[in-house]
């Protein structure tokens, strides 16, 4: 599954 904003790792996944 693609990484969503605010997934498991803070900061990471900020690909809006």
From Swiss-Prot:
Subcellular location per the Swiss-Prot or TrEMBL entry: Mitochondrion; Cytoplasm; Peroxisome matrix
Keyword rRNA-binding: no
CC annotations in GO: mitochondrion; peroxisomal matrix
Catalytic activity entry: a hydroperoxide + [thioredoxin]-dithiol = an alcohol + [thioredoxin]-disulfide + H2O
Keywords, sorted A to Z: Antioxidant, Cytoplasm, Mitochondrion, Oxidoreductase, Peroxidase, Peroxisome, Redox-active center
Documented EC number(s): 1.11.1.24
Example GO molecular function: thioredoxin-dependent peroxiredoxin activity
Quaternary context: Monomer.
Function: Thiol-specific peroxidase that catalyzes the reduction of hydrogen peroxide and organic hydroperoxides to water and alcohols, respectively. Plays a role in cell protection against oxidative stress by detoxifying peroxides and as sensor of hydrogen peroxide-mediated signaling events.
Family: Belongs to the peroxiredoxin family. Prx5 subfamily.
Other known facts: On the 2D-gel the determined pI of this protein is: 5.8, its MW is: 16.9 kDa. The active site is a conserved redox-active cysteine residue, the peroxidatic cysteine (C(P)), which makes the nucleophilic attack on the peroxide substrate. The peroxide oxidizes the C(P)-SH to cysteine sulfenic acid (C(P)-SOH), which then reacts with another cysteine residue, the resolving cysteine (C(R)), to form a disulfide bridge. The disulfide is subsequently reduced by an appropriate electron donor to complete the catalytic cycle. In this atypical 2-Cys Prx, C(R) is present in the same subunit to form an intramolecular disulfide. The disulfide is subsequently reduced by thioredoxin.
Name used for this protein in its record: Peroxiredoxin-5
Species per Swiss-Prot/TrEMBL record: Vulpes vulpes (Red fox)
